[in-house]
């Protein structure tokens, strides 16, 4: 049974004929931020944490999507999986961006270091907070 066209992966869509691509709906996903100051965030940020993700975060960094998937658990992981399956952006535009506190719109594939995650955790997710709102407004205008 063929899958619905919207469920096809981005790589499958790249092989479509030009006239089919022109009619295909375009979708960009903005994913809401994870709670970077919650229990799971504190767990991965702890200098005493010895599990693999915490060590990777401290050493080379983690992709934001992987980091927020751990911090938020199934909620963010599900949103990210859905966005990866159904994103269909116009050319030259990323299909998925994550709203981050203090950093604006960031690709889920961007590496985040321990220090960068600490900076994110320091900014409240609050539209009244300039450190949260201004980077988001800046990136939304680009």
For the regions a language model picked out, list residue spans one by one.
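Peripheral peptide segments
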Residues: 2-142
